[in-house]
């Protein structure tokens, strides 16, 4: 509670107490104290509840008929009938004193509640005490004014000092009413001011927490020197900044080891404007060369593939205690800032997938660029032939081709070793072939018996992810070799053609090749096989023991 509010409450209480005291003096007149009374005439002392005459007093009564004690009405202001009516009202003097006393108690209780109770609970209590105090004070004023008027009309012109003190009592009771409004209104304002002061002490106000200290305010400089790579920032951390104030500062999101070409990327929390469109425009303006639109799109597309996700939490400026640094592009230290047509090799872009020290709920996700559909197919074709890291892809492709158990037969040629090991027919042809005589199929050819050796099981490779199932050594001859030896349609001798053929080949068997036609070993070759052939690498089928490269 502020000092001015306390002064007003003090004036209210003092006025109520003085009014109560004056009314109490009027209440204890004769016959209680025979020396004092409202009026003295003809040795008769008139009081509130009786009178005293020549040392003897009457019994206390609320109406002792003061109009009958005098023989003549000429000595009084009013006649006997009026004085008889007023004599019945004079007993309200102690009631007026009691009402002012209750108002005085309400004032004291209001002061105590405002000082003791907390600010969130004192509001309702103060409102209740205001209405109660106002009610008692109003009734006390009315009763004090009434008794003052009655006494003067009844005993005038023979009044004593006890009658005169009723006038200031009534006046003070009238003054109490506006003082009550002022006191409670100031107390409500003082509570708001106290809450404001508490908030100012805690530093929770944002408008002007330091009213008297100019050096304690925030030092905001819009044109400060904290400009990092073209990004103007606000100097929120001045020399006079208080330690108790919390403020959020946006960290420097541009990493120190970032590629210079990526410095134009704008980091924003909204996705209204595509940052990749800005990126392409900035590169076009910075290069100043006459690149056409198609080359510009290709350059932007290649650049988009080299970007990776940035995390503020895992950046070097996000944490002070050694968070994982996020590298945008790792290209083995090659300088690509001047080469605008540089393409990032596939598989070389590394993205940190480890969680940050602050939280493990965040995951690294690759940035999904806006790709140009018109350039996508051309980029794939150029990548397949002009990939910078061909050695790595060739080694992986050859390894997968050799050790894979699921490979299309149409993409493999005939194994030369197995082809050379197959028996050849003589010029005369086989001796046991019979002419075609209505047989559905010609008789099987008889070749010299060749001892079939079961294939040796390949040693288990180092990487078990390519072995889809465990292979077992067949118990008998290979069915494919038996079919090749017993069916004349699989006679692949270069100079010998079977003498008799079935005009309509059987279902599931391919016709024999022409006499002068060599075995077809060429077919569709993917890009990685063409690179293998250019580098004189042997095929994977040359190390196997069957024509189709089965294992």
From Swiss-Prot:
The keyword Membrane applies. One of its GO terms (cellular component) is plasma membrane. Forms homo dimers or homooligomers in MCC microdomains. Interacts with BOI2 and RHO3, two key regulators of secretion. The chain crosses the membrane at residues 8-28, 89-109, 136-156, 161-181. Protein involved in secretion and cell wall organization. Contributes to cell surface-related functions as a auxiliary component of MCC/eisosome that specifically interacts with the secretory pathway. Residues 321-341 have a biased composition (Low complexity). Residues 1-7, 110-135, 182-551 are cytoplasmic. PANTHER family: AEL027WP (PTHR28013:SF8), PROTEIN DCV1-RELATED (PTHR28013). It comes from Saccharomyces cerevisiae (strain ATCC 204508 / S288c). Disruption phenotype: Renders the cells more sensitive to the cell wall-disrupting agents Congo red and calcofluor white while. The modification Phosphoserine is found at residues 224, 232, 363. Its main location: membrane. This is Uncharacterized membrane protein TOS7. It is found in: Vacuole membrane; Cell membrane.
């Amino acid at each position: 509670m502020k000092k001015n509010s306390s002064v007003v409450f003090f004036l209210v209480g003092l006025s109520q107490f003085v009014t109560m005291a004056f009314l109490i003096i009027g209440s204890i007149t004769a016959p209680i104290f025979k020396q004092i009374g409202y009026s003295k005439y003809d040795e008769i002392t008139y009081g509130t509840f009786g009178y005293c005459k020549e040392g003897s007093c009457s019994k206390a009564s609320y109406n002792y008929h003061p109009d009958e004690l005098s023989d003549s009405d000429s000595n009084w202001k009013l006649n006997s009938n009026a004085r008889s009516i007023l004599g019945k009202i004079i007993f309200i003097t102690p009631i007026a004193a009691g009402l002012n006393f209750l108002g005085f108690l309400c004032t004291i209780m209001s002061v105590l509640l405002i000082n003791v109770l907390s600010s969130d609970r004192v509001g309702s209590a103060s409102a209740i005490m205001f209405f109660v105090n106002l009610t008692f004070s109003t009734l006390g004023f009315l009763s004090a004014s009434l008794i003052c008027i009655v006494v003067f009309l009844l005993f005038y012109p023979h009044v004593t000092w006890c009658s005169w003190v009723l006038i200031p009592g009534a006046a003070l009771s009238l003054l109490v009413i506006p003082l009550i409004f002022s006191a409670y209104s100031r107390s409500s304002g003082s509570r708001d001011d106290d809450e404001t002061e508490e908030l100012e002490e805690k530093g929770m106000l944002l408008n002007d927490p330091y009213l008297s200290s100019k050096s304690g305010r925030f030092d905001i400089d819009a044109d400060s020197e904290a400009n990092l790579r073209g990004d103007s920032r606000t100097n929120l951390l001045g020399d006079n900044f208080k330690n108790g104030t919390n403020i959020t500062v946006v960290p420097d999101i541009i990493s120190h080891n970032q590629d210079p070409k990526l410095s134009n990327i704008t980091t924003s929390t909204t996705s209204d404007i595509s940052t990749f469109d800005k990126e392409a425009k900035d590169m076009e303006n910075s290069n100043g060369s006459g690149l056409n639109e198609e080359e510009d799109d290709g350059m932007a597309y290649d650049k988009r593939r080299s970007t990776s996700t940035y995390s503020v939490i895992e950046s070097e400026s996000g944490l002070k205690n050694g968070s994982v640094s996020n590298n945008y592009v790792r290209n083995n230290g090659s300088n690509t800032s001047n080469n605008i047509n540089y393409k990032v090799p596939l598989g070389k872009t590394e993205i940190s997938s480890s969680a940050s020290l602050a939280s493990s709920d965040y995951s690294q996700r690759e940035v999904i660029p806006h790709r140009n559909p018109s350039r996508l197919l051309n980029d794939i074709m150029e990548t397949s032939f002009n990939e910078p890291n061909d050695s790595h892809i060739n080694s992986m492709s050859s390894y997968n081709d050799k050790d894979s158990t699921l490979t299309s037969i149409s993409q493999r040629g005939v194994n030369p070793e197995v082809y050379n090991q197959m028996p050849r027919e003589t010029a005369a042809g086989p001796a046991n072939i019979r002419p075609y005589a209505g047989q559905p199929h010609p008789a099987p050819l008889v070749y010299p018996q060749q001892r079939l050796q079961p294939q040796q099981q390949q040693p288990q490779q180092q990487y078990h992810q390519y072995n889809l199932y465990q292979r077992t050594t067949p118990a008998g001859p290979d069915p494919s070799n038996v079919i090749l030896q017993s069916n004349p349609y699989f006679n692949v001798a270069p100079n010998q053609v079977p003498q008799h053929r079935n005009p309509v080949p059987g279902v599931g068997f391919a016709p024999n090749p022409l006499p002068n036609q060599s075995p077809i070993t060429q077919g569709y070759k993917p890009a990685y096989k063409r690179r293998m052939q250019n580098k004189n690498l042997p095929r994977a089928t040359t190390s196997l023991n069957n024509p189709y490269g089965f294992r």
